[in-house]
A protein has these predicted regions:
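S-adenosyl-L-methionine-dependent methyltransferase catalytic core, i.e., the SAM/SAH-binding region
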Residues: 7, 100, 118-120
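Conserved alpha-helix/loop element of class I SAM-dependent methyltransferases that forms part
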Residues: 24, 32-54, 64-68
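A short acidic, Gly/Pro-enriched loop at the edge of an enzyme's catalytic core
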Residues: 106-118
């Protein structure tokens, strides 16, 4: 595939993707790993996370993965810095009672030290 064909393919993919946040479900089943990873991110989180724990998701995207964990909303917080995702989080996370705060893009968290039991 030459450069122009590759760019055309990317543009065609972009037109059908309709990505919001970090939801890449439109590529499910289209990419496979040759070797499975020796660990599973979700499994590690679920092994240690209990309902009473305070959870912070840094750079949550649109909050899709965070919401999929099913953690009690009152014990859940998230940050995001990318403006389109900040707007999405305000629309989806705040109404649920999740403590969402935009990040500053410099790595400074808008929460007091020691506020969380788990940070992902």
């Amino acid at each position: 595939m030459n450069r122009n064909e590759l760019i055309s393919a990317w543009k065609a993919e972009e037109e059908i993707a309709h990505i919001h946040g970090w939801d890449f479900s439109h590529i499910d089943g289209r990419h496979t790993e040759q070797d499975d990873l020796p660990w599973d991110y979700r499994a590690v989180i679920e092994e240690y996370l209990t309902p009473e724990m305070k959870l912070l998701d840094i750079d949550t995207g649109g909050g899709e993965f965070l919401l999929s964990l099913g953690h009690p909303f009152e014990n859940t917080a998230a940050t995001e810095n990318y403006p389109p995702n900040v707007a999405l989080c305000r629309e989806t996370l705040l109404p649920l009672g999740i403590d969402f705060r935009p990040g500053d893009g410099k790595g400074t968290l808008p929460f007091a030290d020691g506020s969380f039991d788990m940070v992902i």
